[in-house]
Amino acid sequence: MRPDVSTASPDQAKPAVELRGVEVAFRLADGTDYRAVRDIDLAIAPGEFVTIVGPTGCGKSTLLNAVAGLVSVRGAVRIFGSPLAGLNRRAGYLFQQDALMPWKTALANVAVALEPAGVSAGEARDRAGECLQRVGLANFMDRYPHQLSGGQRKRVALAQTLIRDPEILLMDEPFGPLDAQTRALMGDLLLSLWSADRKAVIFVTHDLDEAISLADRVVVMSAGPAARIIAEHRIDLPRPRVGADIRLAPRFHALQRAIWADLRDEVMRAYASGAAGAAA
């Protein structure tokens, strides 16, 4: 159930993430400046699931890094109404590639995420076990990364992120390396976890079907450099959702056509300009 703003805490009454006039630029190896994104205005409510799509090289990951506090920005980034200074410690970040330590079991890999918080070893193990149960790995806690499938490793990485109970989830194509069937299962798992916790989510993907099936809102970015937001689409599909079922709905296909109409020319422009070779 979404928070009722009339009775919500002061934090819940403010956007979980707010970007106003945000621009991110980098100095390239040859000394020239590269403006990755510009004029970004975006607000994400507590508990809202937002997906971001755009051509390769348009700065989708750069936006996530701005919200995480990993890059310097011009403009304003606010987290629950407060200006972001340094790392965003209210967010958890799930990358495309996991960072599991090969010498630790699944349980130990998840528990280690609590070490910086000074949590006792016993409590960390208990909480790690609970998180692994939530992601469907109750019978795999003692396995090492090389003994796990790609989907299982991704579940461990998700548990690593969730154990700190972040209020915001930043997800950078987290299911990209997985096969189609495993990717669909991970999407359904993520929706189930999100429905229970209702954290704010910003999810970057190249997969338009994935973007629609997961989100409350899909944000479309232009080709880079100096990419900007060109469209936003409210996803009015009923919840709870199962990805394989919702993709059969006529409304799903109507949304797909509408979003692709905004995205297609930008994808073609990116390929024509060579931006497809830049970092996302």
Regions found by a protein language model. Give the residues of each.
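Helix-to-loop junction immediately C-terminal to a conserved catalytic motif
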Residues: A68
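Conserved ABC ATPase "signature" region
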Residues: E115, G122-F140, S192
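The feature captures the beta-strand-to-loop junction immediately N-terminal to the Walker
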Residues: V53-P55
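Conserved signature/switch motifs of ABC ATPase nucleotide-binding domains
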Residues: R143-H146, R164
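Conserved ABC transporter NBD signature motif
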Residues: G75-G86, R127
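Catalytic Walker B motif of ABC-type/P-loop ATPase nucleotide-binding domains
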Residues: L169-D172
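Hydrophobic anchor residue at the start of the ABC signature
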Residues: L158
